[in-house]
Amino acid sequence: MRLLSFKKSKIVSIGTELEFQIIDCSSLSLVSRSKELMRALKDMRYRDQIKPEITQSMIEINSSIHQSAKEMYDELLELQKILVETAASIDIAFCGGGTHPFQQWTMQKIFPSKRFKKKFNQYRYLSKRATVFGQHIHIGCPTGDDAIYLTHALARYVPHFIAISASSPFYLGINTNYCSSRSTIFNAFPLSGVIPYLRNWQEFSDYYRKMYRWKIIENMKDFYWDIRPKPELGTIEIRVCDTPLTLRKSILITAYIQALALYLLEEKSVQLSHDLYYVYNYNRFQASRHGLEGELTVTDKDRPIPIMDDILETIKKIEQYINGLGNSEYIEELYSDVINKQNDSVLINKIYKQDGSFSKLVAAQCELWLSDSKDRKWMTQPS
């Protein structure tokens, strides 16, 4: 079979998608207001980079393509400013975090687009249960073969990404005792988990065309893999991260993945084999459950190693690529977080323990979401 087209991208160019919670300013619960928000944004600058998600209490911002994490950060701040200005006119707020701590998925409303209606008819309750919030990171690849190699090679590091981004310890009003409860939600979807062990772009093209011919998929979006190729963009898309509490944290995560991807593409240090996936689900569970304090089974070692230690060693290993990309400032901050066992899940638990109030927790998350910005006038603190 002929090859699928793959749009050539600059090596490790970056883009990101961030899904945020739409919050009612009085009750601090999720509120289904994305239709109103999209109408209010109609004539705004960057309108095409702010999009609805499958349920109406979600909103997504998309960066454009960047080589520099700093430039991406500047753009995200501009997008945030537009959201804040628009929110003031319709009395809503936004926050990060992979889950809302006390929302009930049964109360969510599907956004009335043709695509989302079709997905709801196909997946029913799973669609509403997917009212969770993630950061997706795109990494540019020059060729389809590079994309397939990187998709597999980064699978070794998925526990890193889950652990450093974890921000969803509470779900449906309970403490799940997971650092990232969000990362368990999509397991029920078909075509979730990991890409099959396809070794090059030709094998992937053959697989894709068979799945299309069998009417299992219509396009690449029907694959819910943790990491998937995006040939129409010339990228791979990492989909395992919780939405961080701050825009800056999203940049730290992106900067780390960008440098790691460059290291892997340049040095081909991960040897692809089925062994990568023998341990994948267990390692993923360790990161979801325990975060930075989880353990990682590496196939060339005799015993598990702490995820935290593996991240710190990896940062040292890829230092020249971090420096070359100009990401040192962000990685130094990430290194400090990791060595001190700090992620957003730890912070959320700490805030909740102060008052035992989910409403005050959400209010704090809304404030943290604005910590990159000086504009805090929209929020009325709950009594």
UniProtKB/Swiss-Prot annotation:
The top EC class, named as a word, is ligase
Query: Which keywords does this Swiss-Prot/TrEMBL entry list?
Result: ATP-binding, Ligase, Nucleotide-binding
Q: Which GO terms describe its biological process?
A: modified amino acid biosynthetic process
Q: Please give the catalytic activity noted in the UniProt record.
A: L-cysteine + L-glutamate + ATP = gamma-L-glutamyl-L-cysteine + ADP + phosphate + H(+)
* The enzyme's E.C. designation: 6.3.2.2
Source organism, top-level taxon: Bacteria
Q: Which GO terms describe its molecular function?
A: ATP binding; glutamate-cysteine ligase activity
Q: Which InterPro entries match?
A: GCL_type2/YbdK_subfam, GCS2, Gln_synth/guanido_kin_cat_dom, YbdK
What HAMAP family does the record point to? Glu_cys_ligase_2
What protein family does this chain belong to?
Belongs to the glutamate--cysteine ligase type 2 family. YbdK subfamily.
Its job: ATP-dependent carboxylate-amine ligase which exhibits weak glutamate--cysteine ligase activity.
Q: What is this protein called?
A: Putative glutamate--cysteine ligase 2
